[in-house]
Amino acid sequence: MYYRITDEVALRSWTDRGFAYYRRGMRKPLPLPAHLAKTMLRCDGEHDIETTPTVMYLVLKGLIEPCGAGEGPSSWSAYHRCDNVCFPMINLMVTGRCNFNCLHCFNAADNAALMTEWSFADLLDLLDQAQECGVTSFQLTGGEPMVHPRFLDLVREIYRRDMTVFALNTNGSHLTQEVLDELRSIGCDPEMKISFDGIGFHDWIRRRKGAEESALAAMRLCVENAFRVQANTQVNRKNVHTMMPTARLLDDIGVHAMRLIRTTEVPRWEANAPDACLGLEEYYARMLDFCRAYAASGMGMDIETWQFVGMRPQDRSFYLKPVKFASGSHHNGGYCCNCTHIMAAVTSEGEIVPCNQMSGYLLKLGISLGNLHTTSLRELLSDGAYTRIANMDAQDLAAAGHKCATCPHFSYCGGGCRALGLLFSGETTTRGLTYEDPAKCLFFEGGWYDRVREALDGWTNLSPIDA
């Protein structure tokens, strides 16, 4: 009997893990036991194999299917060994250009407008390299990604290679019915992450008259067309008082999630509004007030407050971002960041960075972990400076000998956010990435765990720790 790997499954392996497989549309590969992989490798339409219990199991799981002799798997489904560390996703900044000039842009090292942009030829080359490295999906960002002259062509090329776009970060000003129709015709159904910084303040922070109106119109249009919408909302001393009415407006529109992001001390924001940052304790206090009010509001939109509390009104549950390893799972291992070890970030200059949120600060410090215009993606995703930082684990952080090494809370927070560790370390080299995140220190040492539990009494805590 002849078998083939189904068109909905792709078999892969990487240098840092054994066999794994993707299901179509899945962002992360699933591990595959060696004995199952050994059988799947023979399911190529060329080998006449016995229908054993293992084969039947693989058929029932939808991993293989009977076929005729010579009917092998598709090029996407066929086994491919990737000679690099596994990073299944890329956060791609396709252009630094933007039709806005936001006060807080974290991609910028100063107030100069970013003008760097990937050429379409280089983007196609990057997609081919990503395919060879086992990447399956992209988040597209900018600048404003849709100002790239070949934006829709880029999306088409991603899907032509059997990869997907799972999210689009946009200011919404270029979203039209025609664009949404074209995305759907391509098969692209991303989460629309649309910036909206509070009623009456969005135009100010984006430095564009009419930005608020266009962002709200874009959200309504996306909801009407059944795209999932997340509002990304900067929160600072200027606009924090608008967060509850803003949440009510977004919930009424049908936005499925609101992410409130503390406007951070990145170079451009420090130059433009140095006194507008909420201090860390001030931020926790204002966000706890917001969460308490939101819990009583009856709204159904999911909430995430940056580095603090996430809320799921549908089942009245909440989780705590500082608690990375909850009771029963805390340990001295585990990745420092749940994102950087699965998603590489690439800037419009071609720099590879742990996350785009720290790209402007790294640029200001003159720190480069590699550039795709001079080094291949495979090389950058092999064992080296970038992968050691992106895959830094809690043991690495403890070994650095800073505060985390002896902290009683370390087994829960794992050191916290590496971008904040660098930002507040005072260091000007990558050594700063090994310092503690002071926001997490404040959370545990300042009793914020208990304060959140008390404020959300009656809601299920998904991040319990041993009190």
Predicted segments, located by residue:
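Short, small/polar residue-rich loop motifs at catalytic or cofactor-binding pockets
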Residues: 336-341
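Radical SAM/AdoMet-radical enzyme domain recognition
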Residues: 120-141, 148-279, 283
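Short, acidic, Ser/Thr-enriched surface-loop or helix-capping motifs
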Residues: 24, 346-349
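N-terminal pre-core extensions flanking Radical SAM catalytic domains
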Residues: 1-110
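Short Fe-S-cluster ligation motifs
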Residues: 126-142, 432-467
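C-terminal accessory region of radical SAM enzymes
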Residues: 281-324, 357-405
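Local cysteine-cluster metal-coordination motifs and their immediate loop/turn environment
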Residues: 97-107, 354-357, 401-420
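Iron-sulfur (Fe-S) cluster-binding segments and ferredoxin-like electron-carrier domains
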Residues: 107-116, 359-367, 410-453
